[in-house]
Amino acid sequence: MKYLFSLFIVCSINAANIDTFFAALGKVESSNNPRAINKKEYALGIYQIRAAYFKDSKIGGKHESVYDAAIAKKVCLAYFAKYEPQALKNNDFETLARLHNGGCGWRKNKSATDSYWKKIKKNL
């Protein structure tokens, strides 16, 4: 019984932490506007998801579905699980932020995501 209670607490803490990360991500990307559009990059929704990112997540449907914040979160989680599963499991928000901003090749030029990570970190 103690084990189940401990597991529940750990799972609750992890869920709260990922929610905190997504709150910071939304604030930095769109000022928490689920209808935001970056016309230059055609990045949509609260997390400013580009078409290639959406397609790469493999959740299916249309890119425009990311205007729904719940779907946008699902897209991000699928993308994170695909490219940085250990970071997602460990709540390594620095790695997840850099992946979100720099794409799956972000490690080739880590410094390109430095300022982005600082913005996310400030909002955590």
Identify the function of each model-found stretch.
Residues 51, 55-107, 117-124:
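Alpha-helical segment that forms one wall of the substrate-binding/catalytic cleft
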Residues 3-13:
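Sec-dependent N-terminal signal peptides
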Residues 17-35:
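Short N-terminal segments immediately surrounding and downstream of signal-peptide cleavage
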Residues 20, 41-44, 71:
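Short, well-structured alpha-helical interface segments that form or flank functional binding sites
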Residues 29, 37-55:
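Short N-proximal segments of mature Sec-exported proteins
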Residues 24, 46-48, 98-99:
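Structural recognition of the beta-strand scaffold that forms the well-ordered cores
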Residues 30-36, 103-114:
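Secretory-pathway/luminal and periplasmic proteins that interact with or process carbohydrate-rich
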Residues 16-18, 40, 89-93:
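Extracellular/periplasmic catalytic domains that process cell-envelope and extracellular macromolecules
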